[in-house]
């Protein structure tokens, strides 16, 4: 039966080879069987520019390109960790870049896709930070810096983010229900798929279904499968 996959929040890095191994297994064995593959952000733990080269980055690019070459339509939506992924990455992998909110029609279902961080409006400090770093002039300036400088800045930002999380409540870091409902109504859908919060679940809410993609952890890959009959669910080992 025809089907598609949705994943997010892998946070791939050279310090966690077990996550890379899970991704390799998925891309070699499951992904080629799909019609479409949607990666909804935070594929990498951080991204400092399309010009960065590493064994991991090249391996991931090659895997996506291979799946794309096998006829799978691949899509990538930016996360809060890899929002600087650009057109060069898209060309080298064959993955189409999507905007922050993307309306799709899949197997006769209208679906709204987003990474999920834009729905967490109660985290005021993060939203202010997000607005700053998404300014195009600031991104252009950052990308002009030497790679070593960009790496140091990214490491400092990541460390501060991890520190800030310790002081924030789980409620603040979750989506705002009223705002999320407004977005769903704005796009006229009854199905929303997002990641970011790392709280894998399928929520039946008033008027729509909200699917939250989980993060990938040692020995567990959060993979949502939707088939042409409209059925969907997380793949369980």
UniProtKB/Swiss-Prot annotation:
**Molecular function, one GO term:** UDP-2,3-diacylglucosamine hydrolase activity
Top-level taxon of the source organism: Bacteria
Cofactors required: Mn(2+)
- Annotated Mn(2+) 2 binding sites: 42, 80, 115, 196
Q: Which NCBIfam families match?
A: lipid_A_lpxH, PRK05340.1
Asked if the record carries the keyword Cell inner membrane, the reply is: yes
Upper taxonomic lineage:
Bacteria, Pseudomonadati, Pseudomonadota, Gammaproteobacteria, Pasteurellales
Q: Enumerate the InterPro entries for this protein.
A: Calcineurin-like_PHP_ApaH, LpxH-like, Metallo-depent_PP-like, UDP-diacylglucosamine_Hdrlase
Protein's name according to its UniProt entry: UDP-2,3-diacylglucosamine hydrolase
Note the CDD domains from the entry. MPP_YbbF-LpxH (cd07398)
Q: Which HAMAP family match?
A: LpxH
Residues that bind substrate: 80-81, 123, 161, 165, 168, 196
Q: Which gene encodes it?
A: lpxH
Q: Which UniProt keywords apply?
A: Cell inner membrane, Cell membrane, Hydrolase, Lipid A biosynthesis, Lipid biosynthesis, Lipid metabolism, Manganese, Membrane, Metal-binding
Kindly state what the record says about how the cofactor is bound: Binds 2 Mn(2+) ions per subunit in a binuclear metal center.
């Amino acid at each position: 039966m025809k089907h598609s996959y949705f994943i997010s929040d892998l946070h791939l890095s050279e310090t966690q080879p077990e996550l890379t191994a899970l991704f390799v297994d998925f891309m070699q064995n499951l992904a080629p069987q799909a019609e479409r593959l949607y990666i909804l952000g935070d594929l990498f733990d951080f991204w400092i520019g399309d010009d960065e080269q590493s064994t991991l980055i090249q391996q991931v690019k090659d895997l996506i390109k291979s799946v794309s070459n096998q006829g799978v339509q691949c899509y990538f939506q930016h996360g809060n960790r890899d929002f600087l992924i650009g057109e060069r990455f898209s060309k080298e992998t064959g993955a189409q870049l999507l905007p922050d909110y993307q309306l799709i029609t899949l197997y006769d279902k209208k679906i709204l896709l987003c990474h999920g961080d834009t729905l967490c409006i109660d985290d005021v400090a993060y939203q202010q930070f997000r607005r700053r770093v998404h300014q195009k002039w600031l991104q252009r300036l950052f990308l002009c810096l030497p790679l070593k400088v960009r790496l140091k800045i990214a490491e400092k930002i990541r460390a501060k983010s991890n520190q800030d999380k310790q002081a924030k409540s789980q409620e603040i870091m979750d989506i705002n229900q009223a705002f999320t409902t407004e977005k769903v109504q704005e796009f006229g859908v009854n199905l929303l798929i997002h990641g970011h919060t790392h709280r894998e679940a399928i929520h039946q809410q008033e008027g729509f279904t909200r699917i939250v993609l989980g993060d990938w952890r040692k020995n567990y890959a959060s993979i949502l499968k939707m088939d042409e009959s409209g059925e969907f669910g997380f793949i369980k080992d």
